[in-house]
């Protein structure tokens, strides 16, 4: 069964990133901007407002993605706390996993009430809004690497993003990275939308993202995990 699922996703994934050049997101983006600061307590109402006026799956998902990127901020204090815990428990994944589960309630509360979160919150919010619009969306846990993350020493996943199925094809996206950047010098999150992580080409995406479940690579051209982590 798993082999069948792998082949199904891989076949669809090979086409991901193709056929999107003629899609206009102007209407979806304008709708996303109509609801700044909309309460997440009324999440279904938000999903309906963002997607009902739009005719296609890709436009509906674009409106959801853009709204999240424009209205949700990375919580700097939470980001630092999680980073510190990862460092402290870098050799004890069981302890870190226990802390993460215990801390999840605070993460959800912060997201719903303050519109702030970290990667886990971004990816779960994208998924929930998409599912409310009848769009198949999956949270992908795995490893990421950038200038802020010491990836070589990673022993458990350190990031989350999404896979979304649109028109029977799977695509990858990372709303955390699309929404802005962390400026450590000022200890602030700087909103700065980056479209590069929206429905990205899997061959490009894998340069910075490696899923725990390799089904979600969506490409057969990729490094091994050890190569990705720089251990080889």
Where are these regions (language model features)?
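Sec-dependent N-terminal signal peptides
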Residues: 3-13
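Residues embedded in well-ordered secondary-structure elements
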Residues: 6, 53, 151-153
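A generic structural signal for short coil/turn motifs at secondary-structure boundaries
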Residues: 13, 17, 148-150
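Hydrophobic/aromatic-rich core segments of domains that either
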Residues: 121-203
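Alpha-helical and coiled-coil interaction segments, frequently adjacent to or embedded
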Residues: 183-232
């Amino acid at each position: 069964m798993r082999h069948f699922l792998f082949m199904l996703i891989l076949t669809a994934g090979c086409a991901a990133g193709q056929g999107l050049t003629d899609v206009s997101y102007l209407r979806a983006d304008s709708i996303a901007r109509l609801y700044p600061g909309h309460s997440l307590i009324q999440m279904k109402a938000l999903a309906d407002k963002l997607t009902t006026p739009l005719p296609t799956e890709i436009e509906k998902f674009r409106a959801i993605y853009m709204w999240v990127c424009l209205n949700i901020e990375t919580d700097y204090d939470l980001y630092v706390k999680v980073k510190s815990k990862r460092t402290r428990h870098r050799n004890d994944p069981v302890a870190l996993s226990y802390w993460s589960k215990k801390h999840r309630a605070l993460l959800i509360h912060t997201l719903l009430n303050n519109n702030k979160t970290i990667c886990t919150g971004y990816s779960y919010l994208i998924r929930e809004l998409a599912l409310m619009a009848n769009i198949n969306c999956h949270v992908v846990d795995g490893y990421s690497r950038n200038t802020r993350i010491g990836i070589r020493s990673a022993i458990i996943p350190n990031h989350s993003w999404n896979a979304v199925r649109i028109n029977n094809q799977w695509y990858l996206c990372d709303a955390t990275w699309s929404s802005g950047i962390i400026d450590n010098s000022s200890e602030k999150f700087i909103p700065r939308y980056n479209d590069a992580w929206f429905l990205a080409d899997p061959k490009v995406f894998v340069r910075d993202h490696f899923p725990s479940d390799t089904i979600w690579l969506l490409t057969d051209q990729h490094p091994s995990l050890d190569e990705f982590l720089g251990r080889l």
